[in-house]
């Protein structure tokens, strides 16, 4: 299986369980890997034979600006569902990190991996 990757995607999102986290959006950094089956796009040179990474970035940015999440795990799960559902990818790995959230720690976050069968 081939993989599309999106690295160091930064976006502001409403995420957190503490009252102070709910006052304003926080900047997150996402690392995304999307499985694409076979070599159809490489042979056809047609965007319709792959996952359009620009559309994924736009869709994620819209979701992160609009929705609120308590946990990074829930946010990552939601995004994985978009990739496997709307974009029909068979597999996705998403890492979501809060930047500078904990003193002396540059990033803290989660990584999830889902297939079309296991994503919600």
Over which residues does each language-model region extend?
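N-terminal, polar/charged subdomain of small-to-medium soluble alpha/beta proteins
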Residues: 1-120
